[in-house]
Design a protein with these regions (language model features):
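Glycine-rich anion/phosphate-binding loop at the beta-strand->alpha-helix junction
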Residues: 9
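Helix-loop segments that flank and shape redox-cofactor active sites
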Residues: 1, 16-42, 104-119
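Short, contiguous alpha-helical
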Residues: 120-146
Length: 146
């Protein structure tokens, strides 16, 4: 059911956004300003362009949105982070989570494409956005070429 898939997307996006925001607040060490800015842009982009739109699509499908942290944690395909890892590990974790997000979006797309073109367009936009996030995260993780 499309609404159920969107609930998983909503929960996963929320957990991803909160994790990036947590890292934005708590990152330390060398290159702090760059990490701080990047994590801030990442959580803002996901929050601003996914959360409310996804919830509204769920409601438009005559279903109710999950609305508690417990329910988001239960539905999400990624886990929350309760510790403060080193900056490099923050990036690696977000890269792994972003990859799972892309996989989820790719699972939802054919369902949406069959049932609702507006939602399919939204999912396609999110695939593109998370593809860009993946490129940036992967580039940060690469060792300098010599």
């Amino acid at each position: 059911m499309l609404a159920d898939s969107l609930k998983v997307l909503l929960a996963t996006s929320y957990v991803f956004s909160i994790k990036a925001q947590n890292f934005h607040w708590n990152v330390e060490g060398q290159n702090f300003p760059q990490y701080h800015d990047f994590f801030g842009e990442l959580y803002s982009e996901v929050y601003d362009n996914t959360i409310d739109r996804c919830a509204e699509f769920i409601r438009a499908l005559d279903s109710y949105t999950p609305g508690s942290m417990a329910r988001f944690a239960e539905l999400s395909v990624i886990e929350e982070q309760t510790k403060i890892p080193r900056a490099e590990l923050m990036v690696a974790e977000l890269f792994e989570n972003n990859t799972k997000m892309i996989e989820l979006l790719n699972e939802i797309f054919p369902i949406a494409n069959e049932q609702n073109q507006g939602i399919a367009n939204f999912i396609a936009e999110r695939i593109d956005a998370h593809g860009k996030h993946g490129w940036m995260l992967r580039s940060i993780l690469k060792k300098n070429r010599e």
